[in-house]
């Protein structure tokens, strides 16, 4: 991660950290790095429903026009929609303005290359070097060489038609409840599932610029669980603000997370001969029950650091086509180049339809291990990981677990915290293991 770019683009409080002035520079320098080998390059821009989206879009567009780019505004659309359309429309770059599942005051800018993938570390470093230069030496075209801007609000429909053809059957006879987080999928998802002849009930579909992710969406699926039970729906589907995550709810109102969705998809893909190299890529935060369920079905798992970009890197490296995170980022690389909530939802509902099994039955095959995560504020994260007494207590606990549980002790990427997580067959054991480790961490390097 650099000075400006985090694990998912540039993020910050809009108009305070992520200012229009910075957005102009990001548009100008980012656009240049991605399009410098092309005369009159095409760049597409999408945004979610945040009130700050218009402000940042205007600044980004100005920056892009100033290097001679032709800009196409897509309006409100999901992040995977931008990724798909960048490649489908032969654009040299795509830009999404969103802070995903974050609260309304935050916003972010992320780029996609001509291939529809997020930027490499090298590309981000090149943009950062230009941002830090005292003098802007990039070309300044004038007159007829300046870029122009046009709108292509039909892009959302083009994307929906693409993902719709990834399933063979319609969804007639199914009642689907949708929670769109008052975000980018608010008009897209209801149209998609109604077009597939499902009966739909909706919530979180009235964005006003201020209510994105506010008690709704994939980080707050409790309201959707109530809607599913109230309406007698077969499944609930919750997306986040920019539509790259999915959390589901079964017909009984139980929450089905990203691990369970990945397991259901992996098993089905293996049975139908679609799972490449018989492998799923996930992060170290996936539940132990996920790995055990895969193992029981003869499926291999590959673990990465936390973050969908690391999952994607491993998928590309190994030629895998299914990966994701417990949080609901699920990547189906046969179809699209980033996590996609609506695409994942289509595949999940399609599996229900084809197998004629309710979601509760499909999800119950994966037995989740009780999990506890405790954050400990420390004086020095590096010292904590090198401390011999901390290493020793971790070793002792792992020996006691004897393969029937696991411990993960890792530093926070952004705060002076050590995260201590354990999974075990019972919640009591889980609590005991975590607190034994936490006590040693606090005694050795605790900041309080």
From Swiss-Prot:
Mg(2+) binds at residues 100, 240, 242, 244. InterPro entries: A-D-PHexomutase_a/b/a-I, A-D-PHexomutase_a/b/a-I/II/III, A-D-PHexomutase_a/b/a-II, A-D-PHexomutase_a/b/a-III, A-D-PHexomutase_C, A-D-PHexomutase_C_sf, A-D-PHexomutase_CS, Alpha-D-phosphohexomutase_SF. GO terms for molecular function: magnesium ion binding; phosphoglucosamine mutase activity; phosphomannomutase activity. Its EC number is 5.4.2.10. Binds 1 Mg(2+) ion per subunit. GO terms for cellular component: cytosol. Pfam families: PGM_PMM_I (PF02878), PGM_PMM_II (PF02879), PGM_PMM_III (PF02880), PGM_PMM_IV (PF00408). Keywords: Isomerase, Magnesium, Metal-binding, Phosphoprotein. Its cofactor is Mg(2+). SUPFAM superfamilies: Phosphoglucomutase, C-terminal domain, Phosphoglucomutase, first 3 domains. It catalyses: alpha-D-glucosamine 1-phosphate = D-glucosamine 6-phosphate. The modification Phosphoserine is found at residue 100. GO terms for biological process: carbohydrate metabolic process; peptidoglycan biosynthetic process; UDP-N-acetylglucosamine biosynthetic process. Activated by phosphorylation. The active site is at 100 (phosphoserine intermediate). It comes from the Bacteria. Belongs to the phosphohexose mutase family. Catalyzes the conversion of glucosamine-6-phosphate to glucosamine-1-phosphate. This is Phosphoglucosamine mutase.
């Amino acid at each position: 991660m650099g000075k400006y770019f985090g694990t998912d683009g540039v993020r910050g409080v809009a108009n305070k950290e992520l200012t229009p002035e910075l957005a102009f520079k990001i548009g100008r320098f980012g656009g240049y790095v991605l399009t410098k080998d092309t005369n009159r390059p095409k760049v597409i821009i999408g945004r979610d429903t945040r009130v700050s989206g218009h402000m940042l879009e205007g600044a980004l567009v100005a920056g892009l026009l100033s290097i001679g780019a032709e800009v196409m505004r897509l309006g409100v659309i999901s992040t995977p929609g931008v990724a798909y359309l960048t490649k489908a429309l032969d654009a040299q770059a795509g830009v999404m303005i969103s802070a995903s599942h974050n609260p309304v005051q935050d916003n972010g800018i992320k780029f996609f290359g001509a291939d529809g993938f997020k930027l490499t570390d090298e590309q981000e470093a090149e943009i950062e070097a230009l941002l830090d230069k005292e003098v802007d030496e990039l070309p300044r075209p004038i007159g007829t060489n300046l870029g122009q801007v046009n709108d292509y609000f039909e892009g959302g429909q083009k994307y929906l038609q693409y993902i719709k053809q990834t399933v063979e059957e319609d969804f007639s006879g199914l009642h689907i409840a949708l929670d769109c987080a008052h975000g980018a999928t608010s008009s897209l998802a209801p149209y998609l599932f109604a077009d597939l002849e499902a009966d739909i009930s909706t919530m979180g579909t009235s964005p006003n610029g201020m209510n994105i992710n506010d008690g709704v969406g994939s980080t707050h699926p409790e309201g959707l669980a109530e809607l599913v039970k109230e309406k007698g729906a077969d499944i609930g589907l919750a997306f986040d603000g920019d539509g790259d995550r999915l959390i589901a709810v079964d017909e009984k109102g139980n929450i089905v997370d990203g691990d369970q969705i990945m397991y259901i998809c992996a098993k089905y893909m293996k049975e139908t001969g679609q799972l490449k190299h018989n492998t799923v890529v996930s992060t170290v935060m996936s539940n132990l029950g996920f790995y055990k369920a895969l193992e029981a079905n003869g499926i291999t798992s590959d673990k990465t650091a936390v973050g969908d970009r690391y999952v994607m890197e491993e998928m590309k490296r190994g030629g895998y086509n299914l990966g994701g995170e417990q949080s609901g980022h699920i990547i189906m690389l046969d179809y699209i180049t980033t996590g996609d909530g609506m695409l994942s939802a289509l595949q999940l509902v399609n599996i229900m339809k084809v197998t004629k099994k309710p979601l509760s039955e499909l999800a119950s095959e994966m037995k989740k291990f009780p999990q506890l995560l405790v954050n400990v504020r420390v004086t020095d994260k590096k010292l904590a990981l090198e401390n011999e007494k901390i290493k020793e207590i971790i070793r002792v606990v792992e020996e006691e677990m004897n393969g029937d549980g696991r411990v993960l002790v890792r530093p926070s990427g952004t705060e002076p915290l050590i995260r201590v997580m354990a999974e075990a067959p019972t919640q009591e054991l889980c609590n005991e293991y975590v607190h034994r480790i936490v006590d040693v961490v606090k005694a050795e390097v605790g900041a309080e």
